[in-house]
Amino acid sequence: MASIQSLLENATLPDSPTARLDAELLLAAALGKSRSYLHTWPEREPAPQQAQTFAGWLARRQQGEPVAYILGRQGFWSLDLEVAAHTLIPRADTELLVEVALQLLPETPMHVLDLGCGSGAIALALAAERRLWQVQGVDRIVAAVDLAERNRQRLALSNASFSPSHWFDALHGQRFALIVSNPPYIAAGDAYLVHGALRFEPVCALVVGGCGFDDIRGIIV
């Protein structure tokens, strides 16, 4: 049987700039432990089933699949979110949108809208920081709405809600103090789409016509 240290040393991820971190996250999850456990007990030997699970996950990562999709979880802001292949992986860059939104408006009762909510990352981060806000998230993909609602329930954020809508279509003239969105912004055929994690993410959440500006124009106009 291989030890934790041996499994990590032999975990090869040549195309990942975060190879060691990726391997530690996968092994810790396979063991049902924290990363600190790996460093505290490097000599311990995982059970055969745990080692097999780790090997399978490592093989998927070697093919380029993001760790977030393999584990079904991703950290965003101060939240731990469930993610799935039909939604984008919440990115650290998107936290800037949350920061700006929090700076724009005070913590007084108001309605806020997140267009194209995906996993609910932006809406839930805002709801967690501003308990007096009522934050509504919409997405045209019902599976994404269901995922966002599961995240909301697990985080116990009663001031957030999610419903299906293609942008404003199902909102029937509702008005909001603030609208946030991270819409598709990449033009079809962009070479960027065939590299890295984007190969595994939903094209409909990334690609739009008009050289990547059609949805942005539709939201603004």
Give residue ranges: language-model regions.
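Conserved AdoMet
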Residues: 25-103
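Mobile active-site "lid"/loop adjacent to the S-adenosyl-L-methionine
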Residues: 184-215
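Generic alpha-helical structural signal
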Residues: 5, 9, 52-56, 95-99, ...
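Residue-level detector of well-ordered alpha-helical segments, enriched
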Residues: 3, 19-23, 50-53, 215
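Conserved SAM/SAH cofactor-binding pocket of Class I
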Residues: 92-192
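Residue-level signal for the nucleotide or nucleotide-sugar donor/cofactor binding architecture
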Residues: 49, 89-92, 143, 147, ...
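Non-catalytic nucleic-acid substrate-recognition regions in nucleic-acid-modifying enzymes
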Residues: 1-20
